[in-house]
């Protein structure tokens, strides 16, 4: 929220997010549009589609065709695109010619690998966490290569990423 308030001081800012219902409101230079989230069955289908495409399950869980359509139809209206998590990076088309910033927070794949290591080897969740860790790491690398800037919280994590990703 701090980034949004900072950006909206001198720029027009449009915030898109999943919501319990469709919402559209505006306050001076800041406007908000909420898109109703997919239902449970749709989420399961989107998760399976993500797995079929070798992308993280969480991308499928949080996928919204309405947000995707809005972004594709309105992208040319903005000078800068700021995305606040790995999960929403999926809405940005590849090879975009705009300044893009992704606030990842932390390197999520490491969390999945750590959780997988702590689970008993016969626990089926171990395989799910390991698979999601691999898919998230692959997607993180894609984001590092395709975004103008990536924001991370921890200096330790910044230092741990490959030098060819540092911008």
Language-model-detected regions and their locations in the chain:
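Alpha-helix capping/helix-boundary segments
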Residues: 21, 87-88, 156-158
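Short N-terminal targeting/anchoring amphipathic segment
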Residues: 71-89, 98-101
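Helix-loop-beta element that forms the nucleotide-linked donor phosphate-binding surface
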Residues: 93-98, 142-153, 158-167
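Acceptor-binding helix/loop patch of EC 2.4 sugar-transfer enzymes
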Residues: 40-60, 100-138
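Membrane-proximal helix-turn-helix segments that form the acceptor-binding/catalytic region
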Residues: 3, 65-72, 108, 125-150
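N-terminal subdomain of nucleotide-sugar transferases
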Residues: 1-33, 76
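Hydrophobic/aromatic residues located in beta-strands of well-ordered beta-sheets
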Residues: 13-15, 100, 150
């Amino acid at each position: 929220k701090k980034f949004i308030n900072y950006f909206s001081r001198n720029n027009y800012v449009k915030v898109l997010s999943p919501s319990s219902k469709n919402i559209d409101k505006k306050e001076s230079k800041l406007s908000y549009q909420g898109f109703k989230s997919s239902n449970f069955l749709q989420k399961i289908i989107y998760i399976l589609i993500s797995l079929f495409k070798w992308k993280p399950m969480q991308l499928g869980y949080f996928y919204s065709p309405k947000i995707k359509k809005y972004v594709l139809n309105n992208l040319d209206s903005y000078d800068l695109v700021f995305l606040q998590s790995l999960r929403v990076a999926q809405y940005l088309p590849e090879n975009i010619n705009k300044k893009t910033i992704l606030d990842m927070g932390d390197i999520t794949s490491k969390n999945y690998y750590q959780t997988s290591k702590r689970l008993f080897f016969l626990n089926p969740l171990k395989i799910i966490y390991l698979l999601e860790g691999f898919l998230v790491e692959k997607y993180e690398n894609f984001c590092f290569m395709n975004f103008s800037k990536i924001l991370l919280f921890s200096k330790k994590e910044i230092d741990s990423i490959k030098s060819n990703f540092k911008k």
